[in-house]
Amino acid sequence: MSDSDNIKGVSRRTLLGTTAAAAGVGLAGGAVVTKDGAGFVSTADAQTKSAAPKAPPARPAVQKTEVAPGELDEYYVFFSSGQSGEMRIIGLPSMRELMRVPVFNRCSATGWGQTNESLKVLTEGMQPATREFLKNRGGTFMNGDLHHPHVSFTDGTYDGRYAFMNDKANSRVARVRLDVMKCDKIIELPNQHTVHGLRLQKYPRTGYVFCNGEDGVPLPNDGKVLDNPKEYHSIFTALDGDTMKVAWQVMVSGNLDNVDSDYQGKYCFSTCYNAEEGVTLAEMTANEQDWVVIFNLKRIEEAVKKGDFKEMNGVPVIDGRKGSPYTRYVPVSNNPHGMNTAPDGIHIVAAGKLSPTVTVMDVRLFDQLFDDKIKPRDVVVAEPELGLGPLHTAYDGKGNAYTTLFLDSQVVKWNIDLAKRAFKGEKVDPIIQKLDVHYQPGHNHSSMGQTKEADGKWLISLNKFSKDRFLNVGPLKPENDQLIDISGDQMKLVHDGPSFAEPHDATIVHRSKINPISIWDRADPMFADAVKQAKADGINLEADSKIIRDGNKVRVYMTSTAPAFGLEQFQVKQGDQVTVYITNIDAVEDLTHGFCIVNYGIQMEVAPMATASVSFSADKAGVYWYYCSWFCHAMHMEMKGRMFVEPKSV
């Protein structure tokens, strides 16, 4: 299929027939007989192979995509990693990976999940029941499913303070400080079972962090109710992005999927599948329509003030189910997925997924909707038919939208104004171009396209399958993130980028919005607990290398300056509870140190002018070398020392 081929006349019957067949495959064990009877293929294989004629090589870009040695990318891209649990930072247009920021995962390189500083972040926002559950399981979750990283706003554009992201696996939300590119807060959401969609308040600032609860469970979920879906409830959460505390929650009808907010600070809105509130695939896809749920922020805030809520696990929960004064439910084609606000501040687009259509709404009509002056479907101003499996929509700031078509393996460029005119009956075609991508695209994102400053230069298509696009690396294949030039009249594919499991969403931010530091401030709160303990022990972290014993608790303080640690040896007793504090006093950009104790499973990063600490039980007697694991000096190999663990028998 060529770039300019437009799929027309795709009927709902045809699409649902294909989808129903795929659903049937899932119920039957994931295999179907091929049309020629040759054998069995998986659903995913059938989709990718049917959509994947051999594509021509990527064409030269209209814009300059090469970033020469010594030059810098124009954009940061903050990528999710799905089940890997980290946030990744990519440069655009080079598509080079710049950094990985551990969040919900355990990171061997940095010690995230082992250092005291990271463990505080990972545990302080836990619910009490979870803390008890994990008490004999290492104290923290060892996995995460990081989706939807989004950067904080002021007045409708990025302000570079924070990135927020959700953990679908363990119902958490994290905040990453963009001045140091480190996670500083994680909260587990009470009452909510999974967090899928996450977006931020755009105006006047962030503000609220909006978190969709996808799956319904009994409330409280204590085992007293099990297989009774009528008593399951889904929860929508608004966090305070400054305090990382829950501001309020709303109980809704159906499963929430993706969410976005307006540019006026009045509404946020979520796609909702499973209006049937079923628990099986057949039940969840039975109805012809689901809905978009619109949340009235002012009314919800007033409800909290006047006490119109039920307190559950210490937070106010408002009843926003169908018929509530705090929400409105707009019918759309069944199982909608993506929800994306256009940079014009007027239009929002809900993608159909099981329908070839997307639904365009005008946020200026929401006031009338909540005042009951119009009906829910009256806010719909266009519903163009785009192709098979529309999932997510991005924008160029010029009135055009770009929607991924999962089943067609395409990105379709279409015009919002033309779609509105066609909706009114005018004989115009809103589709401008279709571009083959490789393969099965999910999220897509344009440069600055989620702000009022969309610049219409670049689009990334995050494709779920790569198949034949890269060297074969075995059964587990990389994803394929494809860079598309959208600066001209026609989309042009310019780059294939492999990525490990598994990006769900990304945010493209102009580099002028982000201003990280290179050397830590000694007053930074990240290691404030270490500073406090050192002060109590009479230790100057930037000068002293000493050992403090308090019963069987031993605190080892040492500086590090390449190529030497402040202590070349220290001695403890078997069974001592040891905490080692390392302060890197090299105030030199990019001179990171590491601290690793051989055969003790200890490893951590110590960045310039930072203090890092790790606690462990000295259970193995003997001599154990420690060394700097970051190559920081020509004498790197000699930057080491010995830990003596005196056996109990001595």
Curated annotation (Swiss-Prot):
Pathway: Nitrogen metabolism; nitrate reduction (denitrification); dinitrogen from nitrate: step 4/4. NCBIfam families: nitrous_NosZ_RR. Residues 1-46 form the signal peptide. Ca(2+) 1 binds at residues 464, 479. It is found in: Periplasm. Cu cation Z4 binds at residue 504. Ca(2+) 2 binds at residues 273, 276, 284, 290, 335. Cu cation A2 binds at residues 628, 630, 632, 636. It comes from Bradyrhizobium diazoefficiens (strain JCM 10833 / BCRC 13528 / IAM 13628 / NBRC 14792 / USDA 110). This is Nitrous-oxide reductase. One of its GO terms (biological process) is denitrification pathway.
